[in-house]
């Protein structure tokens, strides 16, 4: 891949990680807490609670994947430019 392509992938991975960390995960944490609260009061079933928790874990995994990819793309840029610490 060219330096330009890797830089574009890095930008995308960083933006994805930031969106997940700053926007989607906080909203999902709020939703899980609300679902847990409703479940404790009998308004939601266990299936709804576990589904909310599963979705939260999926977002956490997506964040880890995006952050990992960002690091890998940074390493690739360093390799392509010969600029490593």
Where are these regions (language model features)?
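Small/polar (Gly/Ser/Thr/Ala-rich) solvent-exposed segments
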Residues: 83
